[in-house]
Amino acid sequence: MNFSAILLLALGLAMDATAVAAARGLSVPAIRARHVLLVAGFFGGAQALMPVIGWLLGARIGPRVQAWDHWIAFVLLAFIGGKMLWEARGDGGDDGGEGETTADPFALSAMFVLAIATSIDALAVGITLPMLNAPFAISVVTIGVVTALLSAAGLFAGRRFGALLGKRLDLAGGVVLIGLGFKILLEHLVLS
């Protein structure tokens, strides 16, 4: 497997994380360095770590992971998306505020769950990398760096989109996450 193929693989794996990062960007009034570091670190780190775990676990759990990865990703993304929708419905409620949600969309626990949900496919890729004769270290680093960069770009794109459309885009972010969960589920159930 040459570097061009590895780069294409990395781009494909990064798409889910980029979409989730864009959804996170919708939910903040301004992007801070902390947000960029969290998004790039969690998503890039998880995408790089999962192939390593997949490679280490190898064929022992490969068939089990592939049989359930889409369900796991769907449940995690639907849960986080549903939580965003629930929090968004409370905007402008009892506190008489400006419509800010109480939860931090960049809380470590939320970022961890989202990073795992968007990187489960990378676990399966890690199992297959040796079969593809791909240089392992180069593949893992490329997957992590590409995901980190695209996720950071997605965060800014989501913020820009949110700035143009106004404050109530937590709803859109929740819908995006739930939609992404359905997309992953349908790809595996229908296209497999």
Swiss-Prot record:
The cellular component terms of Gene Ontology attached to this UniProt record, alphabetical and capped at eight, are: plasma membrane
UniProt key word Manganese = yes
- Cell compartments where the protein resides: Cell inner membrane
Q: In what way does this protein cross or attach to the membrane?
A: Multi-pass membrane protein
Q: Which GO terms describe its molecular function?
A: manganese ion transmembrane transporter activity
InterPro entries listed in its UniProt record: Mntp/YtaF, Put_MntP
Domain of life here?
Bacteria
Sorted alphabetically, the keyword list is: Cell inner membrane, Cell membrane, Ion transport, Manganese, Membrane, Transmembrane, Transmembrane helix, Transport
Pfam entry (one): Mntp
Keyword Transmembrane set for record: yes
Q: Give the residue spans that cross the bilayer.
A: 3-23, 36-56, 65-85, 112-132, 136-156, 171-191
Protein purpose: Probably functions as a manganese efflux pump.
User: What family does this chain come from, according to its entry?
Assistant: Belongs to the MntP (TC 9.B.29) family.
Q: Which PANTHER family match?
A: MANGANESE EFFLUX PUMP MNTP-RELATED (PTHR35529:SF1)
Which protein is depicted?
Putative manganese efflux pump MntP
What is the species listed in this Swiss-Prot or TrEMBL entry?
Sorangium cellulosum (strain So ce56)
Q: Which gene encodes it?
A: mntP
